[in-house]
From Swiss-Prot:
This is Protein-arginine kinase. It comes from the Bacteria. Belongs to the ATP:guanido phosphotransferase family. It comes from Chlamydia pneumoniae. HAMAP family: Prot_Arg_kinase. Its EC number is 2.7.14.1. Keywords: ATP-binding, Kinase, Nucleotide-binding, Transferase. One of its GO terms (molecular function) is protein kinase activity. Pfam families: ATP-gua_Ptrans (PF00217). Catalyzes the specific phosphorylation of arginine residues in proteins. The gene is mcsB.
Length: 358
């Protein structure tokens, strides 16, 4: 099973529209669920996983208000398409292992994804690109309610929805706000703005990578037990909004300071993308972030509507590169191939950038 080309085009275009908030461009929501009639995933045999897969996917047909869903059993899906979906939805899952009994179910709108038999029997995932977080969460809850009526999720009056990881019990909701805050991180103001007592944690964009590649900080709720969806969203919104305002103020201060060290960092980043023949993902994200800061501070000239940070944030990921820059019958995700391809793409896109006189 493969994704149809028109759906792939839809997923790419969903990310090309200008974002309402450049500092806070993306928010995701995940609801973890398990069937009441089955044991948790680590206790299941391959045959039991296949039964659960068939049972859950049979209820993704003709859900009112959601359009068509496409089911992709992982064992039959090309690696680049599996990675493409995880990249698009910013899902931090590792695809290593036996995919038997696992599947992804994607909506044609490009807003919703279901992961079956990954960590729980079912994880419902939604992504918002335009700042309509309440609408996205409401739709995800509607989808959850419909499936609950058909599948009967495991629920305890004391602990709420039951999940493989006890930390996810309760509402089973994990919300993530992705913030691009290079000015706050450069000026080292970020740590002073996070209240450690608040039930919010920070993490990296890239799975298993420390620090904040691309100067992107991911805010998420620490747990969901004893908290409503509305309370979780409100807490994250307050923190994300505070950081967004602080980032704008930090950029203004950096512009007034006119630091030679910052100019050097920005121009070295431009040189890296202009003259490299191989580029790794982390260093590319970092360089793009500093260049975008340079554009915002007026240190780099840019052609009109130059698509630097968005949608390049996605386009430099390896499955997106494979889709858009390789022939359909020969898509290759090997490290050297992707590193060369990434450098070639960035070299072309940075032709329209030049430093202001210093």
């Amino acid at each position: 099973m493969t994704l149809p080309n028109d759906l792939l085009e839809t997923l790419v275009k969903r990310k090309e529209s200008p974002q309402a908030n450049k500092v806070w461009p993306v928010t995701t929501f995940s609801l973890a669920r398990n069937l009441s009639v089955s044991k948790f995933l680590p206790c299941l045999s391959k045959e039991q996983k296949l039964e659960i897969l068939q049972f859950i996917t049979s209820h993704f047909n003709h859900i009112e208000g959601f359009g068509e869903f496409i089911v992709l059993p992982l064992k039959d899906t090309p690696l680049w398409q599996k990675e493409f979906l995880l990249e698009h939805f910013l899902l931090p899952y590792d695809l290593v292992g036996n995919p038997e009994g696992e599947a992804l179910v994607v909506s044609r709108s490009g807003d919703f994804l279901a992961a079956i038999n990954f960590q729980d029997h079912l994880v419902l995932h939604g992504i918002d690109f335009q700042g309509n977080v309440e609408k996205t969460l409401d739709q995800l809850v509607q989808l959850d309610s419909y499936l609950h009526s058909k599948l009967s999720f495991a629920f305890s009056s004391e602990f709420g929805f039951l999940t493989t990881n006890p930390k996810n019990c309760g509402t089973g909701l994990k919300s993530q706000c992705f913030l691009h805050i290079p000015a706050l991180l450069y000026s080292k103001e970020f740590t002073n703005l996070i209240d450690e007592e608040v039930e919010i944690i920070t993490s990296s964009l890239l799975l298993g990578v420390t620090g904040f590649p691309g100067n992107i900080v991911v805010l998420s709720n620490r747990c969901s037990l004893g908290l409503t969806e509305e309370l979780l969203l409100s807490s994250l919104r307050i923190t994300a909004s505070k950081l967004s305002v602080a980032e704008v103020a930090a950029k203004k201060r950096l512009s007034e300071e006119n630091s030679g060290d910052l100019k050097n960092l920005i121009l070295r980043s431009l040189g890296l993308l202009t003259h490299s023949c191989q580029l790794e993902l982390k260093e590319t994200l970092d360089a793009l972030s500093w260049i975008q800061l340079g554009i915002d501070l007026g240190l780099i000239k840019v052609t009109e509507n130059h698509p630097l940070w968005n949608p390049l944030f996605w386009q430099i990921r390896r499955a997106h590169l494979a889709l858009q820059k390789q022939a359909e019958d020969s898509r290759d995700l090997q490290k050297d191939t992707i590193s060369h391809l990434r450098a070639s793409v960035l070299k072309e896109l940075t032709k329209g950038l030049s430093p202001e006189s210093f």
